[in-house]
Amino acid sequence: MSKLPRGLSGRQVRRALERAGFRLRRQKGSHMVLRRDEPFAQVVVPAHPSIDTGTRAAILDAAGMDPEQFRELL
């Protein structure tokens, strides 16, 4: 299992998820909701300058991705 870089911003996470087929559904305040239709997945990403590792792990889990897949999309 490879480590992900620390200090990823919400914008960087959003771009990586968009490369994986997610689209921005809506944004309200400091949170973005991204959705993929096939296979269905919906993820909430905080629009913060830095996302904690636990939050990032939860985002990857909800997206159905492993860290290596995500790293390739960065």
Language model features with spans:
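Basic nucleic-acid-binding interfaces
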Residues: 1-27, 31-74
